[in-house]
Amino acid sequence: MLQTQLQLQLQGVSIFHQLGLLIGLSLILSITWTAYTILSPYLRVKGKRIFNDRGRSELLWTGARKRFQAGARDLFKSAFAQNPDAFYIMTDTDVELILNSKYAAEVRNDKRFDIGKYNEDMFHGTIAGFEMFEDDHVLERVFVETVRNKLTRAIGKFVEPMSQEAADGLQKQWTDNTEWHALPLHQSILRTISQQSSRVFQGFPLCRNPDWLRITVNHTVTFFEAAESLKVWPHPLRPLAAKFLPLCRKLRAEAEEARGIIAPVLKERRARRTQQVEQSIEKNTKNEKKEDEDEDQNEDEETPGDMIEWAEQTANGAIYDPALLQMKVSLASIHTTSDLVSQAIFNLCSRPELVDDLRKEVISVIGQQGWVKTAIYQLKLMDSVLKETQRLKPISIGTMVRTTTSPVTFTDGLQVPPNTRTLVSCHNMWTDAVHANAAEFDGYRFLKLRQKPGQENWTQLVSTSNNHLGFGHGMHACPGRFFAATTAKVLLAHVVLKYDLKLLDDQKPDIIEHGAAQYANVWCGIGVRRRKEEIDLACPMATV
C-alpha cells in the first residue's frame, strides 16, 4: 500500500516535471524564434540602414509591414531622396534591396539574379496548391517556352477570333442599351478579357464555358489571397498551416475543379493525336514521299492551335499538370491585361477628344485592313494611350524582382550580397527628367515620340527599357506582352467604336495602392451607352 502511494507520488512529480520541461522548451523556442525574426533582417543587410525600420515602441516588424502596405510609393520617394542609387527597405513580406532603374541594364540578363527563387519564396512554391511557382519546375519551362515560341508566333491567326469574343463579351456585359447606364467597369472587362484569352488558350467552345471562365477569373484572386494568409505564419509551419487555412483549401479545390473540366478535353486531344500517328504510319510507303508531306500538312491543319495543344508539343512527353499550366497562364495574363484596359478606359472617360481620334484610327485601320496582325500594329495612337496608361500606373511601382544566388558588384561599385531580394524601381517613369510634364496623362505622348527619327522602337507598348519597366526588362521581361497588347487593342477598338463613355458623378476612379502593387479602381463604375458604330467590326472591310 505504501509502495503504491509512493509510486503515484513519483508519477505525479514526473508528469509535472515533463510538463515543466515542455513549457520551458516552448518558451525557449518562442524566444529564439522572436529574436531571430527581429534580428534576421539586420544580419542580412550587413550593417546597412533599413528604411521603414521598426519604431522605438515596436518589438516586431508588424508595424513596418503595415506601413509599407499603406504607403509604399511615399516610402520609396523618401528613401530615394536620401539614397538615389539603392536602399534596403522592409516591405510587407521581408527586407528587400530597391535599385534605381539605371541598374536595370545590368540586372536584365545576369543569371545571378534569379527570378525563380524569388517567386518560389514569395509565393510558397514548395507548398501544395502553390506549385505553379515552384523553382526549376518543368511547368515553368513549358509555360515560358510555349508562350514565347508558340503563342507569340500565332497571334496573327487569333486577332479575328479575339474580336469575335470581344463582341460577344461586351454585348453580354455592357448590353446594347442606347440609354446611359452605370456598370462595374473592372469586373465586366475582366470577364470579357477572360473570354478573349480563353479562345486562344483553350479554344472553342471551352472559352465560353461559364464554369471554366469563373475559375480562370477567380483562381488568381484566390491564389494571392491564400498566399497573403500564409505569410503571417512562420516559415517552418506554413506547409502545415496550408492544409487547414480556408483560402488554401479553396485554392486546391479550384485547381481540382479545373482539372476535372480540362481532363476530358486533353484526353480527346491525346487520343486523336495517337490515331493520327497510327494512320500516318499505316499509309507511309517508301515511294510515296509526296503523300507523306501532304498527310503531315493535313495533320497540322486538323490539330487545334491553342495553348493546350502547344503545351503538349512543348512538353514533348515530360510530365506536367495541364490544368495548372492553364491556371498559370491565366494568372499571368488575364488580370494584368484587364487592369491595364480598365485604367485606360478610366483615362478615356474624361477625354472625349481622344476617344474621337481613337475612333477615327480604328475606322481607318481596321476598316481598310480588317482584323489582321499588321492592322493591330498600325493602331499607333491606341498603342500610345496604353503605354501612357502603363507609364503612370504600372501594375507595381517596382519590377524585375530577383533573388541573388551569389555576390554581385555593379560597374559603379555597388555590392549586393548573395540571397538578397532585389527589385528595380519604376520611379523614373514619373520624373520630368525623363518625360516632360511627367505627372500629366498625355495619350499622344508616345505617338509624337514615335514619329521622331530613331524613336520608332522603344516607344511601342511592347518595348522595354531602363525608363519604361511596365513589362519588366531583359530575359525575364513578360513573355506574354505581345499577346496582352493585342488583346487590349482588340477590346478597346470595340469599346470606343460601340460605346459612349463617361465617369459617374459620385465616383472617382482613384488608384488602389497595396504595398508595391497598384490597381485600377475595382469598385468604381462608369456610365456607358450603345452608339451606332461607323463600321461593322464583324466584317469591317465590307462596310467602309
UniProtKB/Swiss-Prot annotation:
Its cofactor is heme. One of its GO terms (cellular component) is membrane. Heme binds at C478. InterPro entries: Cyt_P450, Cyt_P450_CS, Cyt_P450_E_grp-IV, Cyt_P450_sf. Its main location: membrane. Its EC number is 1.-.-.-. GO terms for molecular function: heme binding; iron ion binding; monooxygenase activity; oxidoreductase activity, acting on paired donors, with incorporation or reduction of molecular oxygen. It is found in: Membrane. Keywords: Heme, Iron, Membrane, Metal-binding, Monooxygenase, Oxidoreductase, Transmembrane, Transmembrane helix. It is a single-pass membrane protein. Residues 291-304 have a biased composition (Acidic residues). The keyword Heme applies. Disulfide bonds: none annotated. The keyword Amino-acid biosynthesis does not apply. Residues 280-290 have a biased composition (Basic and acidic residues). Chevalone E derivatives produced by this cluster are interesting candidates for cancer therapy since they synergistically enhance the cytotoxicity of doxorubicin (DOX) in both MDA-MB-231 and MCF-7 breast cancer cell lines. Pathway: Secondary metabolite biosynthesis; terpenoid biosynthesis. Belongs to the cytochrome P450 family. Cytochrome P450 monooxygenase; part of the cluster A that mediates the biosynthesis of chevalone E and its oxidized derivatives that possess a unique five-membered lactone ring and can synergistically enhance the cytotoxicity of doxorubicin (DOX) in breast cancer cells. This is Cytochrome P450 monooxygenase cle2. It comes from Aspergillus versicolor.
